[in-house]
Amino acid sequence: MRRLGSVQRKMPCVFVTEVKEEPSTKREHQPFKVLATETLSHKALDADIHNAIPTEKVDGTCCYVTNYKGQPYLWARLDRKPNKLAEKRFKNFLHLKQNSKEFFWNVEEDFKPVPECWIPAKEIEQINGNPIPDENGHIPGWVPVEKNSKQHCWHSSVVDYESEIALVLRHHPDDPGLLEISAVPLSDLLEQTLELIGTNINGNPYGLGSKKHPLHLLIPHGAFQIRNLPTLKHSDLLSWFDGCREGKIEGIVWHCNDGCLIKVHRHHLGLCWPIPDTYMNSKPVIINMNLNKYEYAFDAKCLFNHFSKIDNQKFGRLKDIILTV
């Protein structure tokens, strides 16, 4: 199977979208909705969407694995945003022109400072070595997740840099109907993006862990391919999301042959998210966490150690996993 694309920028919707002046169900205090029309977008058609690989859009926070300090590291998303003065100028410009591409940015003066270790996301257009902000005036980028980081404590809980491993959820290699939680070498994930999900991420739509025993996992983007997706018609996709077990997901991301990623979210179709019973929680999950091969004493409180105590145990669904000290 070919390696699927990584998420380095905002993904366009598979359909042309329109704005409706009614309260959003996705974001509190947003007085409008962005809804899909029945017309496929030019970007989707240009990327040959009909021959793309559809995958589950997972609800978490985006991460990236690349080298830092001479070894593979997990990186957290950090968008560089304009300062107040530049943001005001940008909003006034949009109000008059409504085309963000015509706005002139001074990258060195218009943006808030970021840590020295910050890097811009790949595939970002550049002029004279400076990354160009997206249509929202943001420059997508990454910062490395340091060990014991307070700011990124949930990110750091799913990696161990001494053993160079990550805590990953994906399909069991021999049984597509079974999920597996295992320790994966960070080197195997180099230049991939992943989704961090769990107790303290995005309201925990998958019901993982608890406040007393938080649980977080990484899912490589494109890990959950969708079989038997209906045709790319608005009505068919709406029926699929609303009426079948496989449709109980946040959305779909199509991985196109040219590397382009195209999405549709339940909210684009006027459907709710989160929902009570997700497709991810309909599958059994097995723990594969034998740490004996690592010549290293894992911290007694770390997730890897907790999972090693239930190695080879099988659970009916993800939310049934309760880690105790």
Swiss-Prot record:
UniProt keyword list: ATP-binding, Ligase, Nucleotide-binding, RNA repair
Needed co-factor(s): Mg(2+); Mn(2+)
Keyword Repressor: no
GO biological process: hematopoietic progenitor cell differentiation; response to reactive oxygen species; RNA repair
Post-translational changes noted in the entry: AMPylates itself (auto-AMPylation).
Name assigned to this protein: RNA ligase 1
Function noted in UniProt: Functions as an RNA ligase, in vitro. The ligation reaction entails three nucleotidyl transfer steps. In the first step, the RNA ligase reacts with ATP in the absence of nucleic acid to form a covalent ligase-AMP intermediate and release pyrophosphate. In step 2, the ligase-AMP binds to the nucleic acid and transfers the adenylate to the 5'-PO4 terminus to form an adenylylated intermediate. In step 3, the RNA ligase directs the attack of the 3'-OH on the 5'-phosphoanhydride linkage, resulting in a repaired 3'-5' phosphodiester and release of AMP.
Enzyme Commission no: 6.5.1.3
Domain of life: Eukaryota
Organism field: Bos taurus (Bovine)
GO molecular function ontology, one term from the record: RNA ligase (ATP) activity
Pfam families the UniProt entry points to: RLIG1
Record InterPro entries: RLIG1
